Amino acid sequence: MKVFWDGHDAKAWDQAHCRLAGALQQDWAYGETMMALGVACLRARVERDGQPLALAQFIARRVGLIATVALCAHGPLWLQPLSAREKAQVLVALKRQLPLWRPRLALFSPDETEATSGLRWPGMTRVVTGESTVIINLEHSDAQLRAAMDPRWRNRLVAAEGAGLQVQRVGANPAQYAWLMEEELKQRLARGFSGLPLGWIHHYIHARKHVSKTALILRADAAGERAAAMLFLIHGQVATYQVGWSSEAGRDLNAHNLILWQAIQELRQRGVRRLDLGGVNTQRSAGLARFKMGSGGEVITLCGTYM
């Protein structure tokens, strides 16, 4: 089993990532964006007997002055069917051949559920339990999607559809969505939340030639005033919910229910097969968790982080 840390082709990586409906963190543009912000990114291709088995993208950070931690989040991308034992062999090979000075630590959080991962991977130790996320299958019909919604969520959607809200698309040029980033910053400061730097979103959107195909930003207006907005990042056949904001009026009118429903229609037209609403934290963000889980998507618990 050989690991190649250079000589990668961005187009071929993107094609594999799209075909496999890969997560945002394994997207080539994700790594390019992190490097633009001064964060180290490592990419690997694993082969056996000349046949490619996996692609893996790591984000590496120094921890104090002691060690470097490299995280392969929601990866690797498996290029062909492998058993749990074979996958473990790939992870061990990546860990052993990581091109960083010691002391170093390689972490993997595969984009797999506990049921599909096998959990017991020889040579790997789970150090963190898996997070849960909500996935909406956009290949389902409108009738199927609405039937899967929590009845209260669906009732709020129906109410929003009759509330006179005007939903429109926001352009992907920075000046067109700068106000949304300002609102997101206010939310983070008020609630004590952290996340990717807001500048990261701008860099990611513009890491590709066609910025309009990389992001979907929808805004709902009530009585001529901004009431709510949601921003989704598109990577291949998957979209990930990234930013959401609502005014008091927007919350009263259930604007986010309507925006999400219209985003589903728009993303489906763009060829997106799956919408990832992101992590569910019922303790710190109970309201947001209820919104995501009520949308009718499938709650998936990933297998965790391994070293």
Where are these regions (language model features)?
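A short, internal acetyl-CoA/4′-phosphopantetheine-binding micro-motif in the GNAT/acyltransferase core
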Residues: 73-83, 139-140, 244-253, 281
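Active-site/acyl-donor-binding loops of N-acyltransferases
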Residues: 2-10, 33, 60, 119-144, ...
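Aromatic (often tryptophan-rich) hydrophobic motifs at membrane interfaces
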Residues: 91-96, 203-307
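Acidic-and-aromatic substrate-binding clefts and catalytic sites of carbohydrate-active enzymes
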Residues: 80, 112-116, 281-285
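A conserved beta-strand-loop-helix scaffold within acyl/acetyltransferase catalytic domains
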Residues: 3-49, 55-65, 112-114, 121-129, ...
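Non-catalytic accessory segments adjacent to catalytic cores
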Residues: 86-130
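Residues at the N-termini of beta-strands
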Residues: 69, 103-105, 238, 274
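Short catalytic-loop micro-motif centered on adjacent basic/acidic residues
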Residues: 106-107, 168, 274-278
